[in-house]
């Protein structure tokens, strides 16, 4: 896939940068399985993080953000902010400044802590934590959270269902 990874999330997340308090320097996000629609399932198998980190965090960010000319990335982000969210030029410029600084940094300053893949996690218990390692980029973890959730939720559900089938096999 050849798309700016910041555009592979809930696009309104791009607006959060300007909504945080100016003095905020630390933000932690969690992935917590909330519940099951299947009777008798009160735990989920944590699975899919390694693939997400390799294909999305490392490969996609390098290929489609850090290794691209920033002007190209800026045009993509600017288009979403202007046409999709109705941002004014002033708001766009402020937001773009954050992305430009991250592009100049050339890596995602985040730390992801999680239970081991394959762990059976009770519903309502966080299985993953994302936090920034650089106060200037406190917002990056939250920007990743939506895509991470979308990317690993299906593998987690599939692994959980597979576990249930193994019980009866």
Model-derived regions, located:
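Ordered alpha/beta subdomains of enzyme catalytic regions
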Residues: 1-169
């Amino acid at each position: 896939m050849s798309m700016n990874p910041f555009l592979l999330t809930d696009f309104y997340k791009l607006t959060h940068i300007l909504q945080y308090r100016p003095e905020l320097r630390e933000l932690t996000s969690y992935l917590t399985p909330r519940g099951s629609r299947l009777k008798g399932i009160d735990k989920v198998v944590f699975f899919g993080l390694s693939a997400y980190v390799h294909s999305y965090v490392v490969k996609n960010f390098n290929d489609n953000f850090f290794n691209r000319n920033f002007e190209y990335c800026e045009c993509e982000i600017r288009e979403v902010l202007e046409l999709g969210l109705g941002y004014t030029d002033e708001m766009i410029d402020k937001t773009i400044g954050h992305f430009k600084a991250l592009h100049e940094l050339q890596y995602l300053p985040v730390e992801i802590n999680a239970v081991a893949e394959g762990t059976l996690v009770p519903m309502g218990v966080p299985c993953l934590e994302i936090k920034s390692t650089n106060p200037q980029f406190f917002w990056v973890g939250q920007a990743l959270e939506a895509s991470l959730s979308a990317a690993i939720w299906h593998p987690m559900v599939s692994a959980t269902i597979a576990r249930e089938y193994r019980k009866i096999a």
